[in-house]
């Protein structure tokens, strides 16, 4: 009897070791699932409360519990939770009393990273209004479109972006839009100032009755994403979605004594949903910078005692490419949250800057599925978690890149790919994993839905991303499909770029696509152009045109002049061969041009330019 007991005890003692040998990620998988399940239970309980518990409630609790704790660090300025609370009260009152806004209205914000962005957003939440986060890089037609599709009544804009707003001012005034500079004065006719009105009103708390109609399904934010066709689309972010966005910071172990350094633009979901809102939930501190600077990055980390950083893959590559310094490891950063990090850059970053815990993740602003590399497998974006997959239904399906559509079998259903093969990520649309769609774009919302995927009547979200699951169940990002590519951390819609280039008088037809550049994340823009008869290419005119209408990351850096632009059997532009051929003048016999920022024109692409790009002596 005693020997049997000893045998059982020995078995229990060695069980964890045996499990670890047979299933090395078992305990990590279980731990991750339990954390994610806890987030889900918590969010669902928040939604059942009346009124629903939004992210604002978490902020108000932190402001009451730790009023004097630093919330925002910017340059040499420190704002506490209480100060931001009072300032956002003034914002809500000014919007209510002077601008006549009420819950359910939408306000568009066009400004860079600064403390005002945060307390303007909190003021809008206190009033029950939604905020549209406009990309300050876009101009003219795209900017006007982004404003109009969200149904905003008011535009709040930074004075530094005066030229951008004045360009569309007549159209805004025609639509009876109220425009205000986030300043105390205005020198533009038709644009008023806002901060002087904020200064005049009380800092007293805002009555809950001002936001009494807000529920979990109420739109809180509109964040813009370039999709597979056309102009940017406004992804609708509900108050429920904001809570799920903070899940990453909970799973990664963000703490109240952390200082989070954000250089990513606030109009991105990463900085807003994960950075700002994650900080609020943890009761931590945010250190802000208007724009990323590789030379100042670690100095800022030391200045603000930063412990957590946010990144996109490009950002960490810039840091690795910066000149080495003796104090590269002299910092307190323990955690890095982000996506798009290549395996080689990951290794180089950790080797140079220390054993920083990197939490790579995969997600899309409007998507209903996300992954997290909680096992810290270099190069992966996540793992197939068996328990999670029992709750959330997703798959990788075969995709015909040439036809730009999923492959279907003889019965008309999609085909799952085996491990080791690349497939299109799709996730079933359910109450637990909803797809809220795009504001003012029903057709584009429908295009992101896949019907009759595995059986008649089922409905899935089409991520537009190609991923691969290896034989250890790790998930790897492969590429985007269709007419979108990613460069400098931004999605670029090829049709929007093509429409812009096509407005130039000597251009007959345009085919825009992204090409790979060695040692760079994403793909850089390239355009194949067919000239109009009896017209000559003008590199200076084309440069000026795209500089006026496209942000820098969307401008085609390479041009290829072709006599004929090939199309598919469904009359779509053929891109695969062009993508594979890239921009090497030794391979391509067509006329090639390179966008020269210094000369402010497109110049002939030479071997010297190509070699300089390959050697990374010419920055793109």
Curated annotation (Swiss-Prot):
EC number: 6.2.1.15, 6.2.1.3, 6.2.1.24, 6.2.1.7
Keyword Transmembrane: yes
Transmembrane domains' residue ranges: 5-27, 107-127, 262-282
GO molecular function: arachidonate-CoA ligase activity; ATP binding; cholate-CoA ligase activity; enzyme binding; long-chain fatty acid transmembrane transporter activity; long-chain fatty acid-CoA ligase activity; phytanate-CoA ligase activity; pristanate-CoA ligase activity
Source species, domain of life: Eukaryota
Catalytic activity: (E)-hexadec-2-enoate + ATP + CoA = (2E)-hexadecenoyl-CoA + AMP + diphosphate
Segments in the Cytoplasmic topological domain: 28-106, 283-620
Protein name, as recorded: Long-chain fatty acid transport protein 2
Organism expressing this protein natively: Homo sapiens (Human)
């Amino acid at each position: 009897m005693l020997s049997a007991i000893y045998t059982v005890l020995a078995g229990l003692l060695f069980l964890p070791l045996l499990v670890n040998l047979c299933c090395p990620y078992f305990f990590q998988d279980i731990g991750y699932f339990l954390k994610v399940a806890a987030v889900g239970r918590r969010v669902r309980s928040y939604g059942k409360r009346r009124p629903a518990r939004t992210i604002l409630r978490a902020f108000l609790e932190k402001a009451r519990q730790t009023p004097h704790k630093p919330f925002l660090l910017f340059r040499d300025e420190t704002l506490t939770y209480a100060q931001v609370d009072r300032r956002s009260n003034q914002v809500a009152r000014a919007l209510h009393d002077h601008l006549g806004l009420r819950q359910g209205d939408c306000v568009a914000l066009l400004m860079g990273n600064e403390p005002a962005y945060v307390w303007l957003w909190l003021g809008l939440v206190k009033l029950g209004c939604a905020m549209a986060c406009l990309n300050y890089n876009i101009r003219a037609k795209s900017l006007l479109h982004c404003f109009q599709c969200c149904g905003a009544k008011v535009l709040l804009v930074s004075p530094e972006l005066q030229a951008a707003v004045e360009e569309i001012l007549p159209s805004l005034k025609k639509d009876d839009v109220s425009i205000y500079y986030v300043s105390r004065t205005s020198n533009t006719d038709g644009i008023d100032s806002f901060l002087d009105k904020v200064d005049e009103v009380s800092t007293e708390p805002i009555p809950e009755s001002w936001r009494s109609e807000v529920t979990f399904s109420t739109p809180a934010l509109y964040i813009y994403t370039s999709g597979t066709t056309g102009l940017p689309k406004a992804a609708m972010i509900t108050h429920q979605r904001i809570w799920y966005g903070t899940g990453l910071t909970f799973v990664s172990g963000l703490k109240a004594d952390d200082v989070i350094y954000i250089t990513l633009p606030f109009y991105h979901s990463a900085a807003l949903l994960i950075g700002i809102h994650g900080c609020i939930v943890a009761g931590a501190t945010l250190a802000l910078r208007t724009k990323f600077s590789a030379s100042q990055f670690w100095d800022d980390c030391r200045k603000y005692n930063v412990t957590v950083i946010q990144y996109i893959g490009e950002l960490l590559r810039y840091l690795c490419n910066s000149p080495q310094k003796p104090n590269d490891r002299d910092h307190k950063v323990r955690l890095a949250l982000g996506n798009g990090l290549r395996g080689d850059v990951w290794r180089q970053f950790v080797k140079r800057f220390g054993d920083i815990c990197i939490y790579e993740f995969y997600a899309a602003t409007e998507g209903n599925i996300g992954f997290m590399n909680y096992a810290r497998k270099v190069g992966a974006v996540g793992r197939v978690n068996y328990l999670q997959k029992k709750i959330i239904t997703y798959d990788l399906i075969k995709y015909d890149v040439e036809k730009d559509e999923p492959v279907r079998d003889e019965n008309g259903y999609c085909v799952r790919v085996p491990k080791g093969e690349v497939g299109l990520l799709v996730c079933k649309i359910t109450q637990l994993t909803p797809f809220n769609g795009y504001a003012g774009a029903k057709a584009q919302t429908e295009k992101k839905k896949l019907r009759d995927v595995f059986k008649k009547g089922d409905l899935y979200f089409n991520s537009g991303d190609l991923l691969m699951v290896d034989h250890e169940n790790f998930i790897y990002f492969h590429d985007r499909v269709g007419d979108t590519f990613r460069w400098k951390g931004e999605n670029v819609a090829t049709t929007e770029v093509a429409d812009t280039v096509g407005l130039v008088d000597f251009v007959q037809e345009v085919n825009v696509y992204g090409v790979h550049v060695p040692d760079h994340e994403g793909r850089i823009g390239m355009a194949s152009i067919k000239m109009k008869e009896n017209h000559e290419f003008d590199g200076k005119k084309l440069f000026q045109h795209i500089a006026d209408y496209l942000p820098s990351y969307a401008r085609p850096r390479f041009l290829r002049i072709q006599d004929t632009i090939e199309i598919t059997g469904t009359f779509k532009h053929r891109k695969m061969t062009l993508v594979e051929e890239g921009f090497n003048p030794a391979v391509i016999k067509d006329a090639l041009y390179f966008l020269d920022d210094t000369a402010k024109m497109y110049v002939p692409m030479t071997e010297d330019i190509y070699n300089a790009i390959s050697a990374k002596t010419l920055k793109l």
